[in-house]
């Protein structure tokens, strides 16, 4: 099935023949729906920490920062901004020249409010010999948009979100990436005054990110009295997945070559595994606000990090107690209670185990990576969110699931999905080392049965694409997971350019 040229390509990517066989088998058998027992809620698995109870967690985080620990902000930033400008691309190709719909009118009515206005105005003067007001007065709206999106101007249609100017300040404007530098200084500064930030970027944009970091880091170091250590990585070619045709055979392009596609954000578990850190914050690049709105974000980042290190301290004490061999029956009961009630890890079979077997079970469940995930109350339709799911070993635990992982044709499961009270804003803090200070090998904790298949096309032919288990979904399936309610004001993603006009981005 594979020829010499194919094998060369596999070797170059670092993909084995066995992986190809496994991936093709996934197309044949598909992925099973996950068995869920309920959507997580405030009554079941989501912690609510009222204002008067936040201080101990914030203090716990501050105490942890004072130790000699490595804290890293991990920011997935490879996404292209092209989808942000979908409406403007449609305007460019429309058979009318002036704004017609509400989106187009809003964009032009409030164009001066965008942080990129001055840069766009300069591009228009250079390329059209007229400024934006003059072009609008002449009805040349499309000239303004093409200077925003195309390479002759700001080229925003081809750049990643991290490099776009998001927010205006009295003397300057900041990109989304710069907002990450500012935010990091506010809650992730270690005892030596260092802030470590790791961006995952696409190979074609890495140099642009590095240039921006080189140009701007000094300003933020001075402003926040910190030292930054900024690093970058790209998705590994070994995480690309093979495309299949409709008969589940390897898809070949018109030149007869195998077609590989990026495996989605789940591939980043490899990048996260390469980060040497005790605690890692994970948040998407576009979920940022200007300094005037950062207070709530910073408070809740410290709160969820405080929950993480407080729980980790207890887990480590229990694991050290187990290793000592000096524990009583009461202490075994205490540990199983902690596992079931605090970590929401339950297995009915544990009632049948003797203490010696129970200890092995407790140790295996406690000695895993730990994450605390912010969850926001649903305001719109239910989407990806927190559930209680059944794991392969029969244990029920907290998981973040996408709708595609749930059998919505089953009325019972559909009802659970629709009763979801919270959604996943991608706001995680993770502990990556065990009680002996050794790094967990994160790929060991991925549930490979949680990928999914999507349908795409290439050269006018349909193909099947394989998405790896999502980074915060199946890629972290076998972690200990805690959900904490965080306020909606901590969730301000920029999905369209006009989102930048919302109050929290002004």
Q: How should each PLM-predicted stretch be described?
A:
Residues 2-42, 353, 357-367, 371-373, ...:
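Long, compositionally biased intrinsically disordered regions
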Residues 131-138, 152, 156, 286, ...:
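Conserved catalytic alpha/beta cores of large enzymes that bind or transform nucleotide phosphates
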Residues 410-411, 433:
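Long insertion/accessory domains within large nucleic-acid-processing enzymes
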Residues 10, 14, 29, 36-379, ...:
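Domain-scale recognition of functional cores that engage charged ligands
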């Amino acid at each position: 099935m594979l020829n010499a040229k194919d094998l060369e390509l596999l070797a170059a990517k670092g993909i084995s023949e066995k992986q190809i066989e496994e991936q093709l088998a996934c197309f044949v058998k598909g992925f099973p729906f996950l068995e869920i027992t309920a959507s997580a809620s405030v009554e079941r698995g989501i912690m609510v920490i009222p204002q008067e109870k936040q201080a101990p967690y914030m203090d716990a985080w501050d105490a942890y920062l004072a130790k000699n620990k490595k804290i890293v902000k991990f920011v997935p930033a490879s996404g292209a901004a092209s989808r942000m400008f979908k409406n403007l691309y449609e305007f460019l190709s429309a058979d009318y020249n002036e704004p017609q719909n509400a989106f187009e009118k809003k964009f032009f009515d409030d164009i001066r409010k965008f942080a990129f206005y001055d840069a766009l105005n300069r591009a228009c003067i250079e390329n059209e010999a007229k400024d934006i007001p003059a072009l609008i007065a002449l009805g040349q709206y499309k000239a303004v948009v093409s200077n925003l999106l195309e390479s002759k101007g700001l080229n925003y249609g081809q750049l990643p979100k991290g490099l776009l100017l998001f927010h205006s300040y009295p003397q300057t404007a900041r990109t989304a990436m710069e907002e990450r530098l500012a935010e990091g200084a506010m809650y992730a500064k270690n005892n030596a005054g260092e802030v470590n930030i790791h961006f995952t970027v696409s190979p074609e944009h890495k140099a642009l990110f590095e240039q921006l970091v080189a140009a701007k880091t000094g300003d933020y170091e001075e402003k926040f009295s910190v030292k930054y250590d900024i690093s970058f990585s790209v998705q590994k070619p070994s995480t690309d997945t093979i495309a299949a045709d409709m008969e589940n055979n390897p898809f070949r392009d018109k030149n007869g070559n195998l077609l590989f596609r990026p495996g989605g954000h789940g591939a980043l578990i490899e990048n996260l595994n390469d980060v040497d850190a005790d605690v890692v914050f994970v948040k998407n690049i576009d979920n940022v606000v200007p300094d005037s709105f950062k207070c709530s974000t910073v408070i809740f980042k410290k709160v969820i990090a405080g929950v993480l290190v407080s729980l980790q301290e207890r887990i480590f004490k229990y694991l050290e107690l187990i290793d000592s061999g000096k524990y009583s029956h009461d202490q075994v009961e205490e540990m199983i209670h902690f596992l079931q009630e605090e970590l929401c890890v339950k297995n009915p079979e544990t009632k049948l185990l003797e203490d010696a077997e129970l200890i092995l079970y407790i140790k295996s469940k406690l000695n895993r990576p730990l994450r605390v995930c912010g969850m926001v109350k649903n305001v719109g339709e239910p989407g990806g969110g927190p559930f209680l799911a059944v794991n392969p070993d029969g244990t029920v635990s907290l998981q973040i699931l996408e709708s595609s992982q749930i059998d919505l044709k089953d009325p019972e499961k559909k009802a659970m999905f629709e009763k979801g009270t919270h959604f996943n804003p991608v706001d995680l803090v993770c502990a990556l080392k065990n009680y002996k200070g050794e790094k967990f090998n994160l790929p060991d904790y991925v549930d490979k049965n949680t990928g999914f298949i999507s349908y795409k096309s290439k050269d006018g032919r349909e193909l099947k694409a394989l998405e790896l288990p999502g980074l915060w979904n199946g890629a972290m399936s076998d972690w200990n997971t805690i959900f904490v309610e965080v306020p909606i004001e901590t969730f301000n993603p920029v999905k369209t350019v006009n989102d930048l006009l919302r109050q929290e981005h002004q």
